Amino acid sequence: MMNRRRFLYYGTAGVASPLLALGCGSQRRGLPATAAAPAAAGATTPFAVTPGINPDLKAHGAIFERKIHKVGDNIYVAVGWSICNTIMVVGDHGVIIVDTGAEVQSAREVAAEFRKITDKPVQAIIYTCFHSDHINGVKGHASADDVKAGHIVIIAHETLLANVTKSGTIGPILGTRTAYNFGGILAAADIEGMNNGTGPLNRRGGEATFIAPTRTFADRLDITIAGVAMHLVHVPSEAADEIAVFLSESGILLSAEVIPAQTFPTLHPLRGEAYRDPVDWYRSIDALRRFKAAAMVPSHGLPVIGADNVEEILRNYRDAIQYVHDQTVRQMNHGLTPDELVEVVKLPPHLASFQPWMLEFFGTVSQAVRAIYQGYLGWFEGDPIMLAQLPRVERARREVELMGGRDHVLAAASKAFEDGDPQWAGELATRLIRIDRDDMPARRLKASAFRKLGYAQINAIWRNWYLSAARELEGFGFDPVLIQRGIARAITSPDLVAALSARAFVEGFPARLKAEDTLDVTMTVGFRFPDVDEAYGVEIRRGVAQFEEQLPEKTNLTLTLDKATLERIQLGQLTMRDAILGGVVQVSDGPPTEVARFFGYFEMPFTTPIQLVVR
C-alpha cells in the first residue's frame, strides 16, 4: 500500500476553508452507451475472473472528491467535476477562469458553484493547453457573443488552434485509441468506483463546446486583467502548447499539466501522440521553480501549499524525468533495445519512495523508456531480422505448428492461466487469434487473461486498455461500427467544426484517397469559399491527391460554397447533392455528375470498423 503521509500532507495542509479533468477526456461526448455485460469472462468460459480495482488506485480517487478549494485570498479551484480542474482568480471587478473542463454541463455546475463565491463577471479565460478537458467546457463560463463583443478575452498559446484541428488527419484511429485509453467503451460494471489517474471519470454524453482564442502569445505574456497581474509562460510538457500562470502579487503558481495529479507523468500517452521531449519537460519545470512560488495549483489534483513543499515536488519531478531520460539514453548508447531498456531503467529508491507522487497511476516509467528510444532512434533496433519479417499470420501459423498445433497451444495457454501466468496465457492465445480471428475459445481465454491483468493494475490507463481489449475479444456489447459513429459525433460538435478552417477541410482529402481506384485517374477540382476569401484545389494524379494552396488554373470541376455551408455538410445537416440542387453550392467548369465521381475516390472517415486486438 502507498505511503499516505505525503498523500494527506500535500492534499490538505494549509488549504483554507471552504475547500473542489483527452485530448483528452475519459468518456468522450457521443460515444455509444455500451450494453450491460458480465464484468468477467466467466459467464461463457471456465476462466472466471473476479472483478476489482487495485486498492491503491481506488484510494487515489479520494483526491478527486468534488470540492472547491480556496488558495490564498482570491483563488478557488474546482476539483472533481471533470478530469481537469477549473480555477477561478477573483480580481477587483471581474474574474479569470483558467481551464474550463471537458464538457459544458459540468462546466455550468462549476460556474454555479463559483457564483456562490462572487457574482463578478468573467473577464478572461485561459486555456493552458489544447487537450479537450481544458477547453471543451468553455460555454459553461462564457458565451460566444460576449467573446465576440470583447467583454471576455480568451488567452492561449499561439499554436493551440492548430493543435485543436490538426489531429483530424488521424481522427478515426486516434479516436478509437482514445476511447480504449480512457475507458470510453467499458461497461458500467468496469468503471464503477474508478478514476482516470489524473482526475475523475468524465460524465458520458456531455456536450463539447469551443470558442477560439482571441489573444495568443509565443513564449511569455505579462498582462493585468481585473487588477490581477499575471505572468504567462510557455512550458512544453504534457502538451506542446502548455502554458503556466504565475500570480506575482500572491506568489501562487498555476502549474497547468506540468505537474500531474500525484502520479508519475505520462511522458508518452498510450493513445498516441507526437513525441513529448523529456528534456523540454524538465526544463519547463525548472522555469517554474524559478518563480519560487508560495503555493501551486495544478490543473489536475489538489493544490500544494508552502514554498518548501512546492520546491520539493517540482525538484523531484524534474529529477525523475531527467533520470529516466538520461539513463535511457546512456543504456541506448550501450546498445540496449526497448525490451532490454525497460528491464534496467527504474527510478532510484529516493525518487520511487516519493509517494504518492511517483506512483504510476497515470504514466509509467516503462512506456516513457520505450518512447524515448523511439524518439531518438525510431522503430529499427539494429537487427536486420526486423527488416523483412514474415507476415504476422504466417509467422503465427508456423509457430503454432512448431508448438504442436492449435489444440496443444490452447491447452498450454489454459494451463498458464490456471497457474497464475495471464501474460503468457495471453501471448499464446494471440498466436491462435492471428490465424483465426473467430477462434472464440482462444479469444475468451485472452480476454480473461486481460481482465486478470487489468483488475490488478495500479495504472488507470493500463487498466482501461486491458479491459477495453477484453471487451473487444469477448464480442458481446462491442460494436466497432457504433464506436466509429460515436467517435465521429464526439469530434464533430458544431463548435469544433466551426473551428476547422476551410483550408483544413480541403487539406484532409489526400490521406483519404483510395489509391487503388485512381492509379489511372487524373482529375483536378477547385474549391472557392467567397465568404472567407479562400480558394484551394485538389489534383488526383495516378494514386496521389495533391493539395493546392491556390485555385488551380485549369480544373475539371470547381465548387463554390460558403464556409457556413461547408460546416452544415460536415455536420450531416445537409448533403452535397441537396446543396447543389438547392443552389447553395455552385458547380462550374464541369458537369455536376463529376462531383459524385470526385468524392467517390475518397473514403468517408469513421465508416470503417476498427478492431485493435482481434487481428
Language model: regions and residue ranges:
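N-terminal secretory signal peptides and thylakoid transit peptides that target proteins
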Residues: 1-15
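C-terminal motif of bacterial Sec signal peptides marking the signal peptidase cleavage site
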Residues: 22-23
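Feature captures hydrophobic
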Residues: 35-40, 412-415, 421-427, 434, ...
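Conserved beta-strand hairpin/beta-sheet module of binuclear metal-dependent hydrolase folds
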Residues: 65-118, 244-257
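Active-site metal-binding motif and surrounding structural segment of the metallo-beta-lactamase
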Residues: 68-71, 92-94, 104-154, 216
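Metallo-beta-lactamase
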Residues: 70, 94-96, 102-104, 162-234, 280-292, ...
